[in-house]
Each structure stands twice: as structure tokens, then as C-alpha cells.
Regions:
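Short gly/ser/thr-rich secondary-structure transition/capping motifs
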Residues: 9-10, 30-37, 105-108
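Structural microenvironment flanking redox-active thiols in thiol-disulfide oxidoreductases
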Residues: 62-99, 109-116
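Thiol/disulfide oxidoreductase modules built on the thioredoxin-like
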Residues: 96-101, 108-159
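N-terminal targeting signals for export/organelle localization
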Residues: 1-30, 162
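A short beta-strand-turn-helix
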Residues: 27-50
Length: 162
């Protein structure tokens, strides 16, 4: 019982993810904009990429969104969106309104892929290396500080690796 009480008092932003340095969960999901197309996580083997879990109903997603658009425009890293437990039409309208930073946005309607990734809530962002290993998990909105001090330096280092 003591473990449960301690666990309930922990801030999920400070709980280390058991997925760090482990293979990213495998998925095959339909594209948001072209539902007849499927993206598989294995499609990204050989490149460093980010997976951003987002939803149109998520207020914090709107807070981080301009930074993701800037990062996408910089060309530093491809960003893939995992649209989480959302309505397709609403999600597409949201991206049209706020900008679409995603190379591809895929749909996790039932949240099963989010569960596989250990999503506590949205937004969450993962940096995945060329071998498909999760190297970083950002719980909550991406911030300028997180980008400058952690995420971008990590991406640049991972891109140098063979």
C-alpha cells in the first residue's frame, strides 16, 4: 500500500519512461489526410525522427504547436503526428487553422498505440533514432528550453551516428 501512495504523489513528468533506450513500439496506422494510406513505424528505420502525440481537444497541444511548426520549417528533423483519440474531421480542421508541422499525421482513434508508447496524456513527444530506439520522451508540451537544451542537441548527435 505504501508503494501505491508514493506512486500517487509522483509527478508523471518526472517519472522516467521504461521505453527510453528500448525499441519503439511497432505500429501500422492510417494517415489522417489520406486514410487509404498506411504508415508503419518501420518505414522510418534509417532516420532520426520525432513522434508527437497530439489532439485537437488538447489545450497544451495548441501551446506547443507554434514551436513544432518552427522546428518543421527548420528541416532539422521530420516530425510525425500521432493524432490521439480524436475525430478525423476536427483534427484536419485544427491543423488547417494552426498549421501542419507533420511529415505525416497518423490516426490512433482507439488509443492503443498511445498505450503501447506509455502515453500519460497529450501532448507527448518522442525522439527515435535510426535503429528505431526511443532516445527521449517529452511529457507535456515541447518548450523552447527543452528544444534548445535537450531535443535538438540530441537529434543532431543521433544524426551523426551510423
Amino acid at each position: 500500500a505504501a508503494f501505491l501512495l508514493v506512486g500517487l504523489t509522483l509527478n508523471p513528468r518526472q517519472v522516467p519512461s521504461p521505453l527510453i533506450d528500448k525499441p519503439a513500439p511497432v505500429f501500422q496506422l492510417n494517415h489522417l489526410h489520406e486514410p487509404e494510406k498506411v504508415m508503419a513505424s518501420q518505414d522510418n528505420l534509417g532516420k532520426v525522427w520525432m513522434l508527437n502525440v497530439w489532439a485537437s481537444w488538447c489545450v497544451a497541444c495548441r501551446d506547443e504547436h507554434p514551436l513544432l511548426v518552427q522546428l518543421a520549417n527548420s528541416g532539422i528533423v521530420p516530425i510525425y503526428g500521432l493524432n490521439y483519440k480524436d475525430e478525423r474531421t476536427t483534427a484536419m480542421q485544427w491543423l488547417k487553422r494552426y498549421g501542419d508541422p507533420y511529415t505525416i499525421s497518423i490516426v490512433d482513434q482507439d488509443g492503443k498505440v498511445g498505450i503501447d508508447y506509455g502515453v500519460y496524456g497529450v501532448p507527448e513527444t518522442y525522439v527515435i533514432d535510426k535503429k528505431g530506439i526511443i532516445r527521449h520522451k517529452q511529457i507535456g508540451p515541447v518548450t523552447v528550453d527543452a528544444l534548445q537544451k535537450t531535443i535538438i542537441p540530441l537529434i543532431l548527435e543521433l544524426q551523426k551516428q551510423v
